[in-house]
């Protein structure tokens, strides 16, 4: 059976051991195995102007199986090629001239890509209650100090590349929306120096499809509720996001209830690959980070600021299929009263800081299916004095090579089981 460490004094810490330790535990039940497999294979991507989503509920405690099965049951659609299908307005580049039109009506002609896209968006039906779509055909530049603002019930499909130039301040982004609902970005390619690639605040029913951001500054995708923290941003679906070169995070959320993410791929970003702050009811298929947060305490996957806390408790509501980290800062980092999380598979190699750091977190299950940690910083269960200590942490199914596993101080109801140490040490309670 696994070794359980209840709230024991630090003096009862076991002696450090370097030998391989393997404990066999029963396999998951058939139902659990099927649910986990289904979740790992499901990536939800909604496309098309008529694809509407349903607001998340007020965060009732889900069961392990029901949440995964509900996500798996969501309609998965194959993403159409950029620009295909019907649309209501378009912005088209011909030579050096942009033209925005709706039907036979021309709403803009000139050399300004941002103005053309905004004119196309503004030509959509006023006061609409169903989605209308704008297609952008062509590549161009937008200033970092400006934005394309999307009102409610708007679909944007960018078939080309937006290069963000110069500097700016505040919450400027090539794609921006605030206080809206039913926003969709089907395709988006970005380069350059944005403050944010996509900035969404206090929104509901958001779909982000295929996003590719090859940046030299800024933050990739930021979705939050910081305009009115009394209201959750609700029901956000992200297909696949690739971000390289950002000086901050690839993807960050804050104050979101109801999040579904396919894959976040982060390459040489300055901080985290995926950072979830105060986000509940989230399902993530994969985080794949290489060189995320070099020289920092950020991580390929980070949870902070009471992430996963529903009311005053931590039911399992954050589900991650796989976290991959190569180099960078940390691999997995849970901090500041976060929890309610299960990470099925972990693959961490040569992280510059802790491979895993769990600090003042509650109900976190690491490597529920399998995991490897090779080289890099230690696996550490720690605590700061300003928050209650770790509670209900499970570390299991890990093969740890050329590293160490350490718990200090002793947490409450910590479980270590089925971990194999290869040329590694262990000091746990």
Where are the regions that the model predicts?
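Beta-strand repeat architectures
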Residues: 121-131
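Right-handed parallel beta-helix/beta-solenoid
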Residues: 70-119
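N-terminal extracellular ligand-recognition/capping segment immediately after the signal peptide
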Residues: 130-172, 190-194
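Intrinsically disordered, low-complexity Ser/Thr- and acidic-rich flexible linkers and loops
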Residues: 224-231, 295, 301-314, 385-387
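Secretory targeting and sorting signals
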Residues: 2-60
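Right-handed parallel beta-helix
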Residues: 157-161, 181-192, 204-217, 232-245, ...
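C-terminal region of N-terminal signal peptides and the immediate post-cleavage residues
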Residues: 49-78
């Amino acid at each position: 059976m696994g070794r359980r460490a209840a709230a024991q004094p630090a003096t009862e810490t076991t002696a450090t051991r370097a030998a391989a330790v393997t404990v066999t535990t029963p396999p998951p039940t058939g139902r659990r195995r099927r649910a986990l497999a289904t979740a790992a294979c499901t990536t939800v991507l909604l496309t098309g102007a008529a694809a509407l989503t349903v607001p998340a509920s007020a965060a009732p405690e889900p069961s392990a199986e029901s949440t995964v099965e509900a996500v798996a049951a969501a309609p998965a659609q194959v993403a159409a090629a950029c620009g295909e299908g019907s649309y209501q307005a378009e912005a088209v580049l011909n030579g050096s001239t942009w033209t925005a039109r709706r039907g036979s009506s021309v709403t803009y002609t000139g050399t300004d890509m941002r103005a053309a896209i905004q004119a196309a968006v503004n030509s959509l039906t006023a006061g609409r209650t169903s989605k209308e779509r704008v297609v952008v055909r062509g590549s161009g530049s937008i200033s970092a100090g400006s934005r394309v603002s999307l009102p409610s019930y708007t679909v944007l499909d960018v078939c080309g590349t937006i290069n963000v130039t110069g500097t700016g301040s505040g919450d400027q982004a090539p794609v921006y929306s605030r206080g809206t609902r039913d926003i969709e970005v089907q395709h988006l390619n970005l380069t350059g120096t944005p403050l944010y690639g996509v900035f969404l605040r206090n929104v509901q029913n958001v779909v982000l499809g295929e996003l590719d951001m090859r940046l030299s500054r800024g933050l990739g995708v930021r979705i939050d509720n910081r305009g009115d923290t009394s209201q959750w941003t609700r029901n956000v679906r992200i297909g696949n996001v690739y971000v390289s070169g950002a000086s901050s995070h690839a993807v960050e959320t804050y104050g979101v209830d109801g999040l579904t993410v396919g894959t976040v791929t982060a390459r040489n970003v300055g901080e985290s690959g995926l950072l979830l702050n105060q986000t509940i009811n989230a399902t993530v298929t994969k985080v794949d980070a290489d060189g995320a947060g070099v020289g920092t305490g950020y991580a390929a996957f980070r949870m902070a600021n009471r992430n996963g806390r529903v009311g005053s408790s931590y039911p399992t509501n954050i589900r991650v299929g796989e976290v991959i980290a190569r180099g960078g800062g940390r691999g997995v980092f849970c901090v500041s009263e976060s929890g309610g999380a299960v990470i099925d598979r972990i693959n961490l190699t040569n992280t510059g800081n802790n491979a895993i750091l769990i600090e003042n977190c509650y109900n976190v299950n690491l490597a529920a299916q399998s995991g490897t940690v090779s080289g890099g910083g230690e696996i550490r269960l720690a605590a700061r004095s300003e928050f209650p200590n770790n509670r209900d942490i499970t570390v299991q199914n890990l093969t740890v090579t050329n590293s160490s596993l350490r718990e200090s101080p002793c947490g409450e109801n910590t479980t270590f089981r089925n971990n194999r140490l290869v040329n590694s040490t262990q000091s746990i309670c």
